[in-house]
Amino acid sequence: MVSLIKSIKAHSDKAWSVSAHKTVPLLATASTDKTSKIYKLSVKQNFPQVAQLEDTHKRSVRAVSFKPPLPGVESNFLDLPALASGSFDSTISIWGIDEPETEILSSPRNEWNLMAIIEGHENEIKAVGWNHNGSLLASCSRDKTVWIWETDPETLEEFECISVLNDHQHDIKHVVWHPHQNLLASSSYDDTIRLYKQDLDDDDWSCVGVLNGHEGTVWCSQFEDNHRHQESNESSNRSKIRLVSVSDDMTARIWSKYIPSSIKHKSEMVWEQESILPPVHQYPIYSVAWSAQSGKIATVGSDGKIVIYIEGDDNSWSIDSVKESAHGVHEINSIIWALLDDQSEVLVTAGDDGCVNIWKP
């Protein structure tokens, strides 16, 4: 049963997006009020606001994304938190903090600094996302393009555009990276999801897959962060990647791709629609999150419901729980799984009421 832990009146206008840092208990928000805010994910401290990022974007902040921690870096001084925010003003802001984790968590306020402003898109930015090691940042826009930016994840001083992908026919709503490899997915108003990889021979990025099946705008997609399918298919020399997507057509669909252990041609990568989750939503579904801990999937959308799905041993999906009117009469724009400072897992939602709600799933 989904129960409310805390409702934060974070913004004076719509809250569009939320992002949680993977190792430091911090939560970032994005809003039409042109600000991003950062909160501590601490029940004991009552989820205090520790920073407000403002006076940079001229229009709505549509998306936020924390940079993942550097792999294998143990010192907090070498890997400080950073945040990307994407705006309807067509720019991306990169924010950083000079305090180690111990000071971040003990201080009532954190000083976040603007490190870079990235320009290139011609229209509103709809989503931003970092790859698994923070060396690449993807952005998508109403201008029908996906841009990939390369940076040094230790300094974040410069961002170079290394690819502009224009395969979609309409507005692109969302981008997301695979949690462990450089595989990128984009979701679009043209009812499709596209997958991109870099060619190892010439370093060019290209579309390596198109997922057709939705009968309306695809608002969001998320990769599964789970190694069990890879482990279970070791004997067949194939690894399995799964992706969940949600759409205007009120469905959530799971797609899977088998990749041979030695791949020579793009044609050897085969995607298939694995399942459609049991129907619950009565209006468009805007956001989906796949838990790395429990394997559960959570969806939200225009009808104000939170729906949680659980997978059985036979790979069939069932409804775990439903929360009606999670933001009153308002639409819900974003949902994520996050870890509190005690390592317990929660759901976080952002709605048209400007509230960011934290839930016990």
Curated annotation (Swiss-Prot):
Any one GO biological process: tRNA wobble uridine modification
Complexes and interactors: Interacts with NAR1.
Keywords of this entry: Cytoplasm, Nucleus, Repeat, WD repeat
A cellular component annotation (GO) from this entry: nucleus
PANTHER family assigned to the protein according to its UniProt record, in alphabetical order: CYTOSOLIC IRON-SULFUR PROTEIN ASSEMBLY PROTEIN CIAO1-RELATED, WD40 PROTEIN CIAO1
Domain of life: Eukaryota
Biological source species: Scheffersomyces stipitis (strain ATCC 58785 / CBS 6054 / NBRC 10063 / NRRL Y-11545)
Compartment(s): Cytoplasm; Nucleus
Protein known as: Probable cytosolic iron-sulfur protein assembly protein 1
InterPro entries: CIAO1/Cia1 (IPR028608), G-protein_beta_WD-40_rep (IPR020472), WD40/YVTN_repeat-like_dom_sf (IPR015943), WD40_repeat_dom_sf (IPR036322), WD40_rpt (IPR001680)
Family affiliation: Belongs to the WD repeat CIA1 family.
Keyword DNA-binding among UniProt keywords: no
Pfam families: WD40
Name of the encoding gene: CIA1
WD repeats: 10-49, 56-105, 120-160, 167-206, 213-265, 280-319, 327-361
Main localization (coarse): cytoplasm
Function: Essential component of the cytosolic iron-sulfur (Fe/S) protein assembly machinery. Required for the maturation of extramitochondrial Fe/S proteins.
Coiled-coil annotated residue ranges, if any: none
